[in-house]
UniProtKB/Swiss-Prot annotation:
It comes from Klebsiella pneumoniae subsp. pneumoniae (strain ATCC 700721 / MGH 78578). It is an enzyme of class 7 (translocase). Residues 6-234, 255-495 form the ABC transporter domain. It catalyses: ATP + H2O + (2R,4S)-2-methyl-2,3,3,4-tetrahydroxytetrahydrofuran-[AI-2-binding protein]Side 1 = ADP + phosphate + (2R,4S)-2-methyl-2,3,3,4-tetrahydroxytetrahydrofuranSide 2 + [AI-2-binding protein]Side 1. It is found in: Cell inner membrane. This is Autoinducer 2 import ATP-binding protein LsrA. One of its GO terms (cellular component) is plasma membrane. Belongs to the ABC transporter superfamily. AI-2 autoinducer porter (TC 3.A.1.2.8) family. The complex is composed of two ATP-binding proteins (LsrA), two transmembrane proteins (LsrC and LsrD) and a solute-binding protein (LsrB). PROSITE patterns: ABC_TRANSPORTER_1 (PS00211), ABC_TRANSPORTER_2 (PS50893). It comes from the Bacteria.
Length: 496
């Protein structure tokens, strides 16, 4: 048997006295794709950060090739050929794509040629001279992967790499992963998507509560076994009565929808989209599908006031808000959950309690009790895993960070809730909770506009789906007509 590229033995780690890794063993072979699954807070990202030298273990040993280490640092990890592509791309927004890829990379005469080779291998059309701040999340992910490839990574860690990629981009990434396998690169593939895991990974490990509870060849396990290993208790995917009680929105909700739409958009044109019209009524969930670059996020950001439209008008409950500031639109009940929670959504070093109520701050003498009550409400309703409300958001897992952001949006008393990739980085067992949460919100006469790259999410959830292609609507599907094939056909500019 070939010597493994990587062996982690009895890795332990605590944060604030809470054990997040409990004696983890993990092995990666040359040319192997080893999938890593687990619920939010299971410890997947922490384990990978330890392997990449970003975090320091409390105990345990890492063996890379023939060398054993008690701990690594990022520079040493890079020297050893380890590269972590994080769940949230970490780019320098004011630098170009080329500068981001080559940052701190030793200069070589063949650097430009090597970079062009990598771009061709990825079949990547990204503009190297563009500013990183202009990139969609999918392109940011590609930049991170290119960083690793340019550093001759022998161990590549991909943390939810397809979370915001379209099917075409995902397949292109998979082709590159297979090419890397042929070069004996070992790949750790963290994902919640079982079809992708079965397509790529020969081996799988499942983590729960900081421990590896299942590990072996992927083909040896059924989907039900893998899901049950993550969530041992059978879950009813409908929200419990207790959860529904805790999710009752603040403020005065209308008991009956009005005879006019909550949102009305006429001939709206802006950066990335042209002449869009839209009406959403109270209690309706409208899906907005399309490929990355189709203009969905730009449209949502314009509705919220983050971008200035070139033409068109916007009404919220029959009051024109076209010229209102973002703050004014928020005060009127238009609430937006952004695509990238770490860059545009959360204050990572601030505590959970402050992040949750920041849209709806109480008077200072009420603040402590109010924040504690709000954190408790959403801790119960959404199952947010945290030690207490003073815990910095940065220390939470990606899925729990997303739940904090959702809690903030709900606490802002929305009339219209726009959610951009709401289940990005959220595990299999928690996705159903978010779907039911959106249904519960809509049942309280809130209008919901949902953007997602995972078109499967719209089936059975959206009342109707609008599909965008190159900045325009390519079609609209009623609830009974919503299928993955029809949405993808429209997304590529075809006729459903």
């Amino acid at each position: 048997m070939m010597k493994p590229l990587l062996e982690a033995r009895q890795i332990c780690k605590q944060f604030s006295g809470v054990a997040v890794l409990k004696g983890i063993d993990f092995t990666l072979g040359a040319g192997q794709v080893h999938a890593l699954m687990g619920g939010n807070g299971a410890g997947k990202s922490t384990l990978m950060k330890i392997i990449a030298g970003v975090e320091t273990p409390d105990s345990g040993e890492l063996t890379i090739g023939e060398r054993a280490f008690a701990r690594l640092n990022p520079a040493l990890a890079h020297q050893l050929g380890i590269y972590l592509v994080p769940q949230e791309p970490m780019l320098f927004p004011n630098l170009s794509v080329r500068e981001n890829i080559l940052f701190r990379l030793p200069k070589r005469a063949d650097t430009a040629a090597r970079l062009q080779d990598k771009l061709q291998q990825l079949n990547c059309q990204i503009n190297l001279d563009a500013s990183a701040s202009t990139l969609e999340v999918a392109d940011q992910q590609m930049v991170e992967i290119l960083r690793g490839l340019m550093r001759e990574a022998r161990i590549l860690i991909l943390d939810e790499p397809t979370a915001s990629l379209t099917p075409g981009e995902t397949e292109r990434l998979f082709s590159q992963i297979r090419a890397l396998q042929a070069l004996d690169v070992g790949i750790v593939f963290i994902s919640h998507k079982l079809p992708e895991i079965r397509q790529l990974a020969s081996h799988i490990s499942v983590m729960r509560d900081g421990a590896v509870v299942l590990s072996g060849e992927t083909a040896a396990y059924r989907d039900e076994q893998l899901i049950n290993a993550m969530t041992p208790v059978s879950r009813d995917h409908a929200l419990s009565d207790t959860q529904k009680l805790w999710l009752s929105l603040p403020g005065n909700r209308r008991t009956q929808p009005q005879d006019f739409p909550v949102l009305r958009v006429e001939d709206l044109t802006g950066e990335g989209f042209i002449d869009l019209n839209l009406e959403i009524r109270a209690g309706e969930i409208v899906g907005l599908a399309g490929l990355v670059g189709s203009g969905r996020t730009e449209f949502a950001e314009t509705l919220y006031g983050l971008r200035t439209p070139r033409a068109g008008r916007i009404w919220l409950e029959n009051r024109e808000i076209s010229c209102d500031s973002t703050r004014g639109r928020l005060a009127s009940g238009l609430v937006y959950l952004p695509e990238d929670r770490q860059v545009s959504g959360l204050f990572l070093d601030a505590p959970v309690r402050w992040n949750t109520v920041m849209f709806n701050q109480p008077s200072w003498w009420q603040q402590g009790k109010r924040e504690a009550a709000v954190v408790e409400r959403y801790h119960r309703a959404l199952g947010i895993k945290l030690a207490d409300g003073d815990q910095p958001v940065r220390t939470l897992s990606g899925g729990n960070q997303q739940k904090v952001l959702l809690a903030r949006c709900l606490e802002a008393n929305p009339l219209l809730l726009i959610v951009d990739e709401p289940t990005r980085g959220v595990d299999v067992s928690a996705r159903a909770d978010i779907y039911q949460l959106l249904k519960s919100v809509a049942a309280q006469n809130v209008a919901v506009l949902m953007i997602s790259s995972d078109v499967d999410e719209f089936v059975g959830l959206a009342d109707r789906v609008l599909v965008m292609h190159q900045g325009r609507y390519s079609g609209e599907l009623a609830r009974q007509a919503v299928t993955v094939d029809r949405m993808m056909t429209l997304a590529f500019g075809g006729q459903a």
